[in-house]
């Protein structure tokens, strides 16, 4: 699917405000209300993979003789619009905005509280 997205003429990369390692809360879907750490971002599809959220079971057949099949559980991706940044210190969710500090460095902060993330 990624190759088909890259081949489009008017393709633009989606700018994501959520990054790998951020703590997010699911705001929509079957796992609504759960929090987890972002393991991977997929900017081309505007999706994120969150630890312990949106688990899928995968049945794996044995590949060699004498080996048994197994059932794996792995995280599937979520659309980035279904998660929101979660602040552990303030215990709230908030949108993220970018700003340039006094030294001229671009940083992120929470819109609700003004807390600087990085």
From Swiss-Prot:
Q: Which GO terms describe its molecular function?
A: rRNA binding; structural constituent of ribosome
Q: Which InterPro entries match?
A: KOW (IPR005824), Rib_uL2_dom2 (IPR014722), Ribosomal_uL24 (IPR003256), Ribosomal_uL24_CS (IPR005825), Ribosomal_uL24_KOW (IPR041988), Translation_prot_SH3-like_sf (IPR008991)
Q: What CDD domains is this protein classified in?
A: KOW_RPL26 (cd06089)
**Stretches assigned to coiled coil:** none
Keywords, A to Z? Ribonucleoprotein, Ribosomal protein, RNA-binding, rRNA-binding
User: Which SMART domains does this entry report, sorted A to Z?
Assistant: KOW
**Which cellular components does GO assign to this protein?**
ribonucleoprotein complex; ribosome
Task: Give a Pfam family name.
Answer: ribosomal_L24
Concerning SUPFAM superfamilies, the annotation shows: Translation proteins SH3-like domain
Please provide the Gene Ontology terms (biological process) for this protein. translation
Would I find rRNA-binding among this entry's keywords?
yes
Query: What range does the record give for the signal peptide?
Result: none
Please give the function described in this protein's UniProt entry: One of two assembly initiator proteins, it binds directly to the 5'-end of the 23S rRNA, where it nucleates assembly of the 50S subunit. One of the proteins that surrounds the polypeptide exit tunnel on the outside of the subunit.
UniProt subunit comment: Part of the 50S ribosomal subunit.
Sequence similarity: Belongs to the universal ribosomal protein uL24 family.
From the Swiss-Prot or TrEMBL record, give the protein name.
Large ribosomal subunit protein uL24
Source organism of this protein record: Prochlorococcus marinus (strain AS9601)
The record's gene field reads: rplX
